[in-house]
């Protein structure tokens, strides 16, 4: 390939189409000036250590960009050339085309890979452009003036209608936010001034029956949960610190052992670490460097050593994290211990399947009544049992699969209604996930139930759906 240093001004592969003035302008823009002509006056000399390929020269203000004239068929190469060419000024584009003797179409990229019926096959003539209609392909007959005016009026009406619709939707959204804030303020006043001051007598009034179903405001949620859970274990402020101190002592003792107890301890620690990695990953509060990470670990270890009859069971971290989002560490420990001491959750977290049989049977009877097709598919066709697809949900308290808002609403209702609420909740979830559960692969069914995030919609709508389900 020849270099521009040896190209003849009047002949040669480039000289045949590049004038001397164009070449001078090209070199002058780069700071090079001809030192003179050769003996025959036909050559333009430059510094001997500056040689450039003359395949395809694209100029800009900073440097020479050489792109091969024979562009590869790959779209990436064409895209690179087109992008380089598009950055040039109009004068530089013209100069680049003159230097390379190529057509501008080389740099033009097609917008669509496939032909489009609405794209013109070629540029319209000046005569056709004079009569073309707006928004109409050039190869079709133009509209009449009356029709074009009519369509323009209709277009303006459609545009105005769309703008009115957008404004209306924005007003509705603002109104919904205002109503939600107003309702939240009302509920805060009711809980603080009426219910908490007159606990528990106020809840017996028909005026406040089922008020927790509307959602407990986050401002008072922690205090309400504490009162609703109760304190049958008679724990106080020092209970957490005593449990944590005992945990540290027992941890040190078990580290020194070399037999079964030490192995069990290592298994518990491993299970705890695995659980922490999947606890509310959307909240940075519980990440490795999160501000609540240490509190959560301390809470779980203190509780696991507080209950000598059980080791750490996967799932405890989810409810522990939810409690820490709404109350301080000592209150969270007291609530966790008292909550998991209730008969139903105690059976869940100690894996006492015999105590869960009545709950399983009630749920299966309700499922067969409300969703017979789904019940037949899960129990007969896939041969699943409640321990496969119900127990893991109860152990996790549904928290990993739902949004934090819905998880809080679930605990709002459970602390007042206990295990009967879980029947309605399970039915609502199975109804909403029914299309994903009617597949023939049990692995996909279990994945949809136990490992995927559920799209249940806004929390208010979902909770209304839960309570609309009839259990009778």
Swiss-Prot record:
One of its GO terms (biological process) is vesicle-mediated transport. InterPro entries: Rab-GAP-TBC_dom, Rab-GAP_TBC_sf, Rab_GAP_TBC_domain. SUPFAM superfamilies: Ypt/Rab-GAP domain of gyp1p (SSF47923). GO terms for cellular component: Golgi apparatus. PROSITE patterns: TBC_RABGAP (PS50086). Residues 215-418 form the Rab-GAP TBC domain. GO terms for molecular function: GTPase activator activity. Transmembrane segments: none annotated. Pfam families: RabGAP-TBC. It comes from the Eukaryota. PANTHER family: GTPASE ACTIVATING PROTEIN AND CENTROSOME-ASSOCIATED, ISOFORM B, RAB GTPASE-ACTIVATING PROTEIN 1-LIKE. This is TBC domain-containing protein C23D3.03c. It comes from Schizosaccharomyces pombe (strain 972 / ATCC 24843).
């Amino acid at each position: 390939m020849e270099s521009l240093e040896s190209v003849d001004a009047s002949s040669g592969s480039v000289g045949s189409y590049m004038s001397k003035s164009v070449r001078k302008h090209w070199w002058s823009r780069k700071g090079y000036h001809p030192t003179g002509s050769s003996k025959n006056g036909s050559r333009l000399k430059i510094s001997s250590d500056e040689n450039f390929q003359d395949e395809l020269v694209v100029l800009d203000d900073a440097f020479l960009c050489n792109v091969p004239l024979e562009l590869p068929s790959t779209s990436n190469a064409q895209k690179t050339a087109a992008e380089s060419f598009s950055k040039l000024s109009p004068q530089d584009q013209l100069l680049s085309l003159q230097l390379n003797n190529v057509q501008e179409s080389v740099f033009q990229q097609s917008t669509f890979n496939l032909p489009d019926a609405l794209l013109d096959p070629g540029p319209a003539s000046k005569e056709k452009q004079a009569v073309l209609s707006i928004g109409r392909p050039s190869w079709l007959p133009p509209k009449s003036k009356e029709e074009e005016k009519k369509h323009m009026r209709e277009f303006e009406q459609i545009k105005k209608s769309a703008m009115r619709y957008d404004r209306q939707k924005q007003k509705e959204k603002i109104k919904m936010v205002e109503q939600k804030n107003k309702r939240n303020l009302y509920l805060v006043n009711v809980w603080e001034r009426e219910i908490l001051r007159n606990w528990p007598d106020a809840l017996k009034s028909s005026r406040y029956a089922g008020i927790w179903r509307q959602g407990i405001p986050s401002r008072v949620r922690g205090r309400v949960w504490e009162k609703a859970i109760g304190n049958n274990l008679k724990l106080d402020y020092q209970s957490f610190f005593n449990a944590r101190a005992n945990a540290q002592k027992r941890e040190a003792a078990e580290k020194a052992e070399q037999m079964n107890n030490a192995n069990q301890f290592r298994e518990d620690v491993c299970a705890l670490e695995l659980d922490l990695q999947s606890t509310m990953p959307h909240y940075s509060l519980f990440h490795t460097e999160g501000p609540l990470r240490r509190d959560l670990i301390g809470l779980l270890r203190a509780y696991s050593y507080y209950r000598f009859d059980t080791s750490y069971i996967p799932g405890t971290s989810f409810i522990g994290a939810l409690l820490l989002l709404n109350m301080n560490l000592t209150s969270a420990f007291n609530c966790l211990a008292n909550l998991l001491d209730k008969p139903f959750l105690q059976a869940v977290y100690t894996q006492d399947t015999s105590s869960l049989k009545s709950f399983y049977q009630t749920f299966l009877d309700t499922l067969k009544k409300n969703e017979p097709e789904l019940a037949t598919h899960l129990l007969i066709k896939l041969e699943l049992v409640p321990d496969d697809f119900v127990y893991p949900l109860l152990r996790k308290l549904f928290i990993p699969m739902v949004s934090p808002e819905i998880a809080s609403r679930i605990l709002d209702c459970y602390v007042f209604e206990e295990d009967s609420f879980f029947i309605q909740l399970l039915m609502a979830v199975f109804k909403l996930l029914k299309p994903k559960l009617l597949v023939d692969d049990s692995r996909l069914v279990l994945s949809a139930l136990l490992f995927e995030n559920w799209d249940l919609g806004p929390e208010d709508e979902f909770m209304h759906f839960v309570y609309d389900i009839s259990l009778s």
